[in-house]
């Protein structure tokens, strides 16, 4: 039977991956929801207007939306299907994307209900990353602890 930590990581990875594939697809194409796609286009236009530096770098609202959508789809697929270290990399990239999205929402003055999802999924991504990293650090700590105990035992003087 799998450990609770493993079950948690797998469940979070799968759920978060599917969510980001879905949301990224909405940003890229109107096939899933025309209304949501139109809303995304409108929102990204306001983000691009609020950051004139993007325009100076040649990043239009369309390009920004497509970059973020592609990152979400790609990293969502990795979180859902790819085992091992690439999941942590995808998790970190998505966490950075969520921070950028929160920044954009704050920049344009959106109310909390417009960006609550980004806040919640940013927290979930952080939790998933912390749990995954904690699971990897534990064997190393135990090995170091055993080495310290062995070193202490060697330094003890036997009294007989």
UniProtKB/Swiss-Prot annotation:
The keyword Membrane applies. The keyword Endoplasmic reticulum applies. It is a multi-pass membrane protein. InterPro entries: TMEM35A/B. Residues 137-160 are annotated as: Disordered. One of its GO terms (cellular component) is cytoplasmic vesicle. Keywords: Chaperone, Cytoplasmic vesicle, Endoplasmic reticulum, Membrane, Peroxisome, Transmembrane, Transmembrane helix. GO terms for molecular function: acetylcholine receptor regulator activity. Its main location: membrane. The chain crosses the membrane at residues 6-26, 62-82, 89-109, 114-131. Molecular chaperone which mediates the proper assembly and functional expression of the nicotinic acetylcholine receptors (nAChRs) throughout the brain. Essential for the proper folding, assembly, function and surface trafficking of alpha-7 (CHRNA7), alpha-4-beta-2, alpha-3-beta-2 and alpha-3-beta-4 receptors. Belongs to the DoxX family. This is Novel acetylcholine receptor chaperone. It comes from Danio rerio.
């Amino acid at each position: 039977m799998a450990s609770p930590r493993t079950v948690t990581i797998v469940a979070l990875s799968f759920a978060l991956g599917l969510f980001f594939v879905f949301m990224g697809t909405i940003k890229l194409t109107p096939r899933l929801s025309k209304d949501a796609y139109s809303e995304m286009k409108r929102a990204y236009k306001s983000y691009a207007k609020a950051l004139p530096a993007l325009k100076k770098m040649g990043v239009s609202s369309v390009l920004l939306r497509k970059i973020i959508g592609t990152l979400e789809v790609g990293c969502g697929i990795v979180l859902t299907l790819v085992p091992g270290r690439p999941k942590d990399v995808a998790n970190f990239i998505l966490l950075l994307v969520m921070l950028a999205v929160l920044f954009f929402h704050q920049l344009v003055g959106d109310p909390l209900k417009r960006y609550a999802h980004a806040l919640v999924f940013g927290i979930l991504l952080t939790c998933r990353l912390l749990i995954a990293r904690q699971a990897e650090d534990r064997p190393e700590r135990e090995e170091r602890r055993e080495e310290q105990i062995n070193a202490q035992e060697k330094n003890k003087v036997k009294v007989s």
